[in-house]
Amino acid sequence: IKETKGDIIIYVDDDALVDSNYIRIYAEHFAAHPDTMAAGGPIEPLYETSEPAWMSPYTKALLTAWMNYGDKVREYPKGRYPGGGNAAYRKEVFDRVGLFNTDLGRKGNLLLASEEKDIFDKMKALGMKVLYLPTPVLHHCIPHAKLEEDYFNRLTLQIGRSERMRTRAIS
């Protein structure tokens, strides 16, 4: 973040694909809406095999980061925020709220999370505008191994640990 030269920082997961107009969509939105401080878009799973029959919207969101709030620009529903793999920020956000808490992020085989939630909570506390944009779609590649019970158990346990660390830091 400190090394970036542009005014807009876009995050894309390393296991994802985006459409050819992805960057342009974010650039045009931020240019036309100077009050938008951050934005995110849909995250659609791209399965190596196929979506399992047991997948519910809840497990789909946990295992694949699936997110879709429709086809209109809007504020995120209460308690929701952009997925970290498909988010764009004005660089000045980090000057105002600080950098990501790297204790919360993924490292090696650890499935910790919530560093984005931490930033968005700080932004919300300052009244910064964060919008959902329906068109910068990210396709999150999901290997079969991420659909197995062992992975689900490790993921949910470590997300819980992350939330504990995050909420202890603000309480």
Labelled PLM ranges:
Residues 21-55:
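Conserved donor NDP-sugar-binding/catalytic core segment of glycosyltransferases
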Residues 1-4:
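Glycine-rich, basic loop-to-helix element that forms the pyrophosphate-binding segment
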